[in-house]
Amino acid sequence: MARTTPISRYRNIGISAHIDAGKTTTSERILFYTGVSHKLGEVHDGAATMDWMEQEQERGITITSAATTAFWSGMSKQFEQHRINVIDTPGHVDFTIEVERSMRVLDGAVMVYCAVGGVQPQSETVWRQANKYQVPRIAFVNKMDRTGANFLRVVDQIKTRLGGNSVALQLPIGSEDNFKGVVDLIKMKAINWNEADQGMTFTYEDIPADMLEACEERRAMLVEAAAEASEELMEKFFSGEELTEEEIKTALRQRVLANEIIPVCCGSAFKNKGVQAMLDAVIEYLPAPTDIPAIKGINEDETEGERHASDDEPFAALAFKIATDPFVGNLTFFRVYSGVINSGDTVYNSVKQKRERFGRIVQMHANKREEIKEVRAGDIAAAIGLKDVGTGDTLCAQDAPIILERMEFPEPVISVAVEPKTKADQEKMGLALGRLAQEDPSFRVHTDEESGETIISGMGELHLDIIVDRMRREFKVEANIGKPQVSYRETIRTTVKDVEGKHAKQSGGRGQYGHVVIDLYPLEPEGPGYEFVNEIKGGVIPGEFIPAVDKGIQEQLKSGPLAGYPVVDVGVRLHFGSYHDVDSSELAFKLAASLAFKSAFGRANPVLLEPIMKVEVETPPDYVGDVIGDLSRRRAMVNGQEANEFVVKINAEVPLSEMFGYATDLRSQTQGRASYSMEPLKYAEAPTSVANAIIEARKAK
């Protein structure tokens, strides 16, 4: 099969926004105008096509980023047909992992803002992620029909809050209830969409007289922003010559691709106005796969490799999402960076070093599927039934293996114990958790060796709520949830010498006798965690009993004498003891060793260690005092701050036990405008008062 759409006419874009900016409605309208969907879905009645998981429809928030393919030739059919792959990204802070993942596979993004609420906190987090992956973007100010809508205020906020160089491409005609349409500042014409056919058709009209001056002023700003693309345009602009429409658009495109400006459109998706012109802007200003740098990767011999967006290069694709579909099982969403693959072909998973067969390939339209025979560079599609592919794996040609950059997934920050309500739920729960962990790399499952409980960990309280909710709905598993937990450790601070342990029983018949003398000493934290040194001379303890001494001590390490937590960073030197020809046995020496260890541990200045997290908070400057004050109350050690005019980054080390509920507290302190990340850093000694409280609580159990 030949390529149907040249790769230069592809646009892989994400639609990304704060919760409630109307992103899903905007995506819906894109599907409607591009002719994919014949009935408009409204989020208000839970019927949007992009939000396809039950909970999303109930909660009215987007959780799974669905990828959809649509075609567009422009409002006035002025372009050749372009293929737009839309990736809908979630806007909630607990799902930033999904946003980050979709940022990897996008070439450009449309940032949707609410004309009333403006640039919201989550928009700042998403913006930082888009900066990290250098994604060119345009903005769409939605909800112009709402009370309190103010387009130019949002254009300003993109500058002041996000540091984005925003330029208005349009001005709204009227606002709130009187929102009629927009003025195209390049053509200097008013666009009036036809309400009778839900905005499918429109007319160009003259700009209302009372807006002419404002439009001319804004157009001058737009043209100047375009002229800065090159010296010759600057000369033309300053000598008073008019730039042609073509020159303006080419120059704006050049600056958007270089991430130097953010063109801003406006409209009301709900009222069917503005999305059509925004789609034109996607084609005019956002990059095709061939406009962005070749994706980098690592070759088999550890050298750096790359893949250009071309059908002629070896096949390379990145799996960016795994979803479970009720009818076909596993769907692996992937983005093809280079080459061509047909259904039935075998590909190589270079991360897991396994071969996979591409059985069926489908292109998704929200929650409907169309089966296709091949995919080419630039395509986004889903494969059905791949066996062992995880998020972030590379699928490539076996004769040209490459690992495209691994995605970095943040460490989970909160853990809770889950237990099935009935015996029947027990088996189903294991299966359900395994499936959910495969879909979502920021969610982990493990069994606590000390308590035997199943522990689930994730990115926040909402994240784990939704996991438990999905277990109930999709896998019909009912479970009880425990309280968030912290894993402590025990160790010693001083060396004790010549501690004796003796196990002797003479009760008629064969007795038991084991006798050891040990030294116990602390080890460096970064070391092996435990060492056993045998210094027995002259056979005072026969060689066959030495391993039993080591084993007896290791069994004690699993549950420390202080509060039953694992013991780390201790060394034992066995240097004396005695035995009995008849009564000594491995068991007797094991018991003697454990008695000696317990006795020595109590004298070696035992302490409790707690996990310390490396915490980074990014907050607007206005809230720095509150954030630092709150961190200090959480026993934080603040290591420093980096600031620019939009955001202050605070680095701190905080005990994990003090971080529960932090996301909620931080949101309320900063009106939701700050974000934070944390990862495990080290174990450190817990202050006496804290340690005593923990030890008392454990004893009470």
Swiss-Prot record:
<dbReference type="InterPro" id="IPR005517">
    <property type="entry name" value="Transl_elong_EFG/EF2_IV"/>
</dbReference>
<dbReference type="Pfam" id="PF03144">
    <property type="entry name" value="GTP_EFTU_D2"/>
</dbReference>
<dbReference type="InterPro" id="IPR009022">
    <property type="entry name" value="EFG_III"/>
</dbReference>
<dbReference type="GO" id="GO:0005525">
    <property type="term" value="F:GTP binding"/>
</dbReference>
<feature type="binding site">
    <location>
        <begin position="142"/>
        <end position="145"/>
    </location>
    <ligand>
        <name>GTP</name>
    </ligand>
</feature>
<dbReference type="Pfam" id="PF14492">
    <property type="entry name" value="EFG_III"/>
</dbReference>
<comment type="function">
    <text>Catalyzes the GTP-dependent ribosomal translocation step during translation elongation. During this step, the ribosome changes from the pre-translocational (PRE) to the post-translocational (POST) state as the newly formed A-site-bound peptidyl-tRNA and P-site-bound deacylated tRNA move to the P and E sites, respectively. Catalyzes the coordinated movement of the two tRNA molecules, the mRNA and conformational changes in the ribosome.</text>
</comment>
<keyword id="KW-0251">Elongation factor</keyword>
<dbReference type="InterPro" id="IPR000640">
    <property type="entry name" value="EFG_V-like"/>
</dbReference>
<dbReference type="GO" id="GO:0032790">
    <property type="term" value="P:ribosome disassembly"/>
</dbReference>
<feature type="binding site">
    <location>
        <begin position="17"/>
        <end position="24"/>
    </location>
    <ligand>
        <name>GTP</name>
    </ligand>
</feature>
<keyword id="KW-0547">Nucleotide-binding</keyword>
<dbReference type="GO" id="GO:0003746">
    <property type="term" value="F:translation elongation factor activity"/>
</dbReference>
<dbReference type="InterPro" id="IPR009000">
    <property type="entry name" value="Transl_B-barrel_sf"/>
</dbReference>
<dbReference type="InterPro" id="IPR027417">
    <property type="entry name" value="P-loop_NTPase"/>
</dbReference>
<keyword id="KW-0963">Cytoplasm</keyword>
<dbReference type="GO" id="GO:0005737">
    <property type="term" value="C:cytoplasm"/>
</dbReference>
<dbReference type="InterPro" id="IPR004540">
    <property type="entry name" value="Transl_elong_EFG/EF2"/>
</dbReference>
<dbReference type="InterPro" id="IPR000795">
    <property type="entry name" value="T_Tr_GTP-bd_dom"/>
</dbReference>
<dbReference type="InterPro" id="IPR035649">
    <property type="entry name" value="EFG_V"/>
</dbReference>
<dbReference type="InterPro" id="IPR047872">
    <property type="entry name" value="EFG_IV"/>
</dbReference>
<dbReference type="InterPro" id="IPR020568">
    <property type="entry name" value="Ribosomal_Su5_D2-typ_SF"/>
</dbReference>
<dbReference type="Pfam" id="PF03764">
    <property type="entry name" value="EFG_IV"/>
</dbReference>
<dbReference type="Pfam" id="PF00679">
    <property type="entry name" value="EFG_C"/>
</dbReference>
<dbReference type="InterPro" id="IPR031157">
    <property type="entry name" value="G_TR_CS"/>
</dbReference>
<dbReference type="InterPro" id="IPR035647">
    <property type="entry name" value="EFG_III/V"/>
</dbReference>
<keyword id="KW-0342">GTP-binding</keyword>
<comment type="similarity">
    <text>Belongs to the TRAFAC class translation factor GTPase superfamily. Classic translation factor GTPase family. EF-G/EF-2 subfamily.</text>
</comment>
<dbReference type="InterPro" id="IPR014721">
    <property type="entry name" value="Ribsml_uS5_D2-typ_fold_subgr"/>
</dbReference>
<dbReference type="GO" id="GO:0003924">
    <property type="term" value="F:GTPase activity"/>
</dbReference>
<dbReference type="Pfam" id="PF00009">
    <property type="entry name" value="GTP_EFTU"/>
</dbReference>
<feature type="binding site">
    <location>
        <begin position="88"/>
        <end position="92"/>
    </location>
    <ligand>
        <name>GTP</name>
    </ligand>
</feature>
<feature type="domain" description="tr-type G">
    <location>
        <begin position="8"/>
        <end position="290"/>
    </location>
</feature>
<keyword id="KW-0648">Protein biosynthesis</keyword>
<dbReference type="InterPro" id="IPR041095">
    <property type="entry name" value="EFG_II"/>
</dbReference>
<dbReference type="GO" id="GO:0097216">
    <property type="term" value="F:guanosine tetraphosphate binding"/>
</dbReference>
<protein>
    <recommendedName>
        <fullName>Elongation factor G</fullName>
    </recommendedName>
</protein>
<dbReference type="InterPro" id="IPR005225">
    <property type="entry name" value="Small_GTP-bd"/>
</dbReference>
<dbReference type="InterPro" id="IPR004161">
    <property type="entry name" value="EFTu-like_2"/>
</dbReference>
